[in-house]
């Protein structure tokens, strides 16, 4: 095996990685689910899961129930980083704008809409109380009222509490509170339940994320996709488990969990319900022809007459920032999907972030991290390039052996190994150093792909978004040129077919990287450039040394 084969294998590995991403999205691993059951879709958009009451031997039968429409009476709440709309019908958050994240480089004045309730795209965060009416779950309509239609967190405020007031027909006086905190994407949602009736009230607290037929970001050879779908964490069993939309269509998730969280993911952004760590819930998924839901329903809640009780959960709607997610709930940071080498990716991102705090530019941070990685692997790379230089000096002797023995491959192989032994050259010496570096490359690959910090982050000149492709495709062309220069430094392959394949590689990689994120292409350019300089120096150094003594290799 020589360095050319390693390059070929790396090319195949890159293509395989892209194909694997596409395969995982199209054919994800099966999740722990049960057979698909019935569900109830109320006219206000709530999908209620099947519940088995303690006094029932069979699962309840869910029936469709007509309810009056909400009329879409909304209130607006604005903080320093969030702008949300709350529907007074059930107190659902039906719009969530992220004020610090523009929609695109071209639309800097439009905030990114993570949650929205449009005809073309519905993505909302529901929370409700419901009871069992015989065998049928029935969502309680409180028709909430609010003191104001617009709430805003003032610059001198650290917290804003929005209270909705409502009453139910069965004797509940409910206050639904939303607690917003300055600089935070986490919202506390609490129900303060007062039983003003004369009988015991028994019901359930339900939270869910509902999304209508989202467009999934699928991978291909020429495009790197990112996971779009649901996920959950069940402490002690599943730290982080994806549930794709295709899984939801086939069968319903049904998992008992203590603590944990449920989430809807997409590239760079996340919504998640985080129950109290000591609360017990049933995590479920439901799917209709156009809607996909992941939810959590509590254990039965009882409130005696004239007594009060508070139930609630936390809702996160914002960017996938690992340092923030770590502080909210265990394993929530795993939604920043760094893949199987997440631990190594996390270390590399921490290094990138530390450099960014000094230089103030993510592009230069990528450049400097690449330099540090090359320095860390300098000796290994030097060993590889030294082996290549030695192999280059042996090319005339190897060619002479091929001419001497013609088509006798056995004698050529035997004579070649004897030559390596006499010249003290290890043909595998250039392979191991490169193989050791591959995990680092893969880990950094996922960091550059998944880190929201690179979204719309400028570098220099025309590169104004490291997470998007170079609009003029200059970087992929430069990257292809660096690969071509690297090939010129290597000895020409003796096999004509292999030589043609090697010449085609720069073209192949240029095509592969044509629409890749600029940050990823930048890494490859810097890495290739540093490799060229190191290889040129070492090759020149060993080429200038006194030539090895001529050794006549003979076949035994």
Swiss-Prot record:
Which residues are listed as membrane-spanning?
Answer: 6-26, 332-352, 358-378, 428-448, 501-521
The keyword Cytoplasm is annotated on this UniProt entry: no
Primary localisation category: membrane
Q: Which UniProt keywords apply?
A: Cell inner membrane, Cell membrane, Chaperone, Membrane, Protein transport, Transmembrane, Transmembrane helix, Transport
What is the membrane topology listed in the Swiss-Prot or TrEMBL record? Multi-pass membrane protein
Task: Tell me the Pfam families matching this sequence.
Answer: 60KD_IMP, YidC_periplas
User: GO terms for CC?
Assistant: plasma membrane
Domain of life assignment: Bacteria
Q: Name one GO molecular function term.
A: membrane insertase activity
GO process terms (BP)? protein insertion into membrane; protein transport
Localization recorded for this chain is: Cell inner membrane
For the keyword Transport, the answer is yes
Q: What does this protein do?
A: Required for the insertion and/or proper folding and/or complex formation of integral membrane proteins into the membrane. Involved in integration of membrane proteins that insert both dependently and independently of the Sec translocase complex, as well as at least some lipoproteins. Aids folding of multispanning membrane proteins.
Quaternary structure and partners: Interacts with the Sec translocase complex via SecD. Specifically interacts with transmembrane segments of nascent integral membrane proteins during membrane integration.
PANTHER family in alphabetical order: CYTOCHROME C OXIDASE ASSEMBLY PROTEIN COX18, MITOCHONDRIAL (PTHR12428:SF65), OXA1 (PTHR12428)
Q: Which family does it belong to?
A: Belongs to the OXA1/ALB3/YidC family. Type 1 subfamily.
Q: What is this protein called?
A: Membrane protein insertase YidC
Q: Which organism is it from?
A: Legionella pneumophila (strain Lens)
Q: What is this protein's gene name? A: yidC
């Amino acid at each position: 095996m020589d360095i050319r084969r390693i390059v070929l294998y790396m090319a195949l590995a890159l293509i395989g990685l892209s194909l694997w991403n596409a395969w995982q999205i199209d054919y994800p691993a099966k999740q722990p689910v049960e057979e698909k059951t019935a569900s109830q879709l109320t006219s206000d958009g709530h999908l209620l899961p099947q519940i088995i009451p303690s006094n029932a031997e069979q699962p309840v039968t869910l029936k469709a129930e007509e309810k009056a429409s909400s009329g879409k009476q909304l209130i607006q709440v604005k903080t320093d980083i969030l702008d949300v709309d709350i529907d007074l019908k059930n107190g659902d958050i039906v719009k969530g704008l992220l004020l610090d994240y523009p929609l695109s480089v071209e639309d800097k004045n439009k905030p990114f809409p993570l949650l929205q309730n449009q005809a073309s795209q519905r993505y909302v965060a529901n929370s409700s109380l419901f009871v069992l009416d015989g065998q049928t779950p029935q969502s309680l309509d409180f028709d909430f009222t609010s003191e104001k239609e617009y709430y805003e967190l003032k610059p001198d405020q650290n917290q804003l509490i929005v209270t909705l007031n409502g009453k139910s027909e069965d004797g509940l006086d409910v206050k639904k509170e939303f607690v917003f905190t300055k600089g935070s994407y986490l919202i506390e949602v609490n129900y303060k339940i007062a039983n003003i009736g004369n009988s015991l009230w028994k019901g359930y607290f339900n939270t869910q994320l509902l999304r209508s037929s989202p467009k999934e970001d699928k991978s291909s050879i020429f495009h790197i996709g990112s996971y779009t779908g649901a996920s959950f964490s069940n402490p002690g069993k599943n730290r982080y488990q994806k549930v794709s939309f295709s899984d939801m269509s086939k069968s319903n998730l049904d998992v008992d969990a203590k603590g944990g969280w449920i989430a809807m993911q997409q590239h760079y952004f996340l919504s998640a319900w985080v129950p109290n760590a000591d609360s017990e819930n049933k995590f479920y998924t439901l799917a209709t022809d156009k809607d996909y839901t992941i939810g959590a329903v509590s254990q039965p809640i009882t409130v005696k007459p004239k007594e009060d009780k508070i139930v609630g959960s936390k809702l996160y709607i914002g960017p996938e920032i690992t340092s923030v997610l770590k502080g909210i709930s265990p394993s929530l940071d795993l939604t920043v999907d760094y893949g199987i080498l997440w631990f190594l990716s996390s270390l590399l991102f921490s290094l990138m972030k530390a450099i960014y705090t000094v230089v103030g530019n993510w592009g230069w941070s990528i450049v400097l991290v690449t330099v540090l990685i090359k320095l860390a692997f300098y000796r290994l790379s030097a060993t590889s390039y030294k082996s290549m230089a030695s192999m280059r000096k042996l090319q005339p002797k190897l060619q002479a052996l091929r001419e001497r023995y013609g088509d006798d491959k056995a004698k050529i192989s035997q004579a070649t190994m004897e030559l390596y032994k006499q010249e003290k050259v290890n043909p595998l010496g250039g392979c191991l150093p490169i193989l050791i570096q591959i995990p680092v490359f893969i880990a950094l690959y996922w960091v550059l792909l998944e880190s929201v910090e690179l979204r719309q982050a400028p570098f220099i000149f025309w590169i104004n978004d490291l997470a998007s492709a170079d609009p003029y495709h200059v970087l992929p062309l430069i990257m292809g040129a660096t690969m071509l220069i690297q090939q010129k430094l290597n000895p020409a392959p003796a096999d004509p077919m292999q030589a043609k394949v090697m010449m085609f590689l720069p073209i192949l990689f240029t095509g592969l990287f044509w629409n890749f994120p600029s940050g990823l292409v930048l890494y490859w350019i810097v890495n290739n450039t540093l490799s060229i300089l190191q290889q040129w120096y070492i090759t020149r150094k060993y080429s200038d040394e006194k030539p090895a003594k001529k050794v006549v290799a003979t076949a035994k």
